[in-house]
Amino acid sequence: MGIFKKNPFGHILFLKRWLIRIAGAMTHRRYRGFNELQIVGSEILTNLPDRNVLFVSNHQTYFADVVSMFHVFNASLSGRTDSIKNIGYLWDPKLNLYYVAAGETMKAGLLPRILAYAGAITVSRTWREKGKEIDRQVNLKDTENIGIALDDGWVITFPQGTTKPWKPIRKGTAHIIKNYKPIVVPIVIDGFRRSFDKKGLRIKKRGILQSFEVKEPLVIDYENDSVEKIVEQLEYAIEQHPSFLKVIPTEEIEAEEELNKKRKWEY
């Protein structure tokens, strides 16, 4: 039974393990080679339980964001701190790691379908499909599948549901948090939009300093906090609240300019 053991979604773990190993080896230099991924807070990952953890993050590309998380999570769980040096951590990857993705995206070609086997929980967008605005009810099966994944392990979600910055948080994420009561860990990424194309499959620029920050779990009163309060908390946590668009002090601008010197494109 060992080699054919499956996860709750029917995926054979032996195949998933090899898929993560191969995909990880093929993409490693995208974050440590062609570009540099600067990681902060990865030690937080080692203190989390093995299941019922929800990671919430801002979103910059379809696939590169998630792939970086597979690298950082597995590297941290294998003993590395803020580093993905030496891809030996891919030999024994965390197999109960999932990510929420639009079904439309994961069916758009052979490669997305293969990547879906690595842990995608596909959901139907309620507001957009094939580039057009729509309005439909939430598919309760989608929510149920996220609950199944949380019961089995860790789940990554992008609560804005789009790669465009400053878009509002979808309330569905807050409802999931209230219903399943996971530990909620925010992640803030940057530099991916400059490094990759929108899909995150093609390298657009090299020599980009990418950043990846893992924050402490949020303090949430699952019973008494309103959906609106949780949404606002998520906006602040992943630094997508409108207040982050405020006028930036001069000293912060100067510090950012120094950092941008490391982000200059190399041709």
Task: Give short role names for the model-derived ranges.
Residues 49-133:
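Catalytic core of membrane glycerolipid acyltransferases/transacylases, capturing the structured
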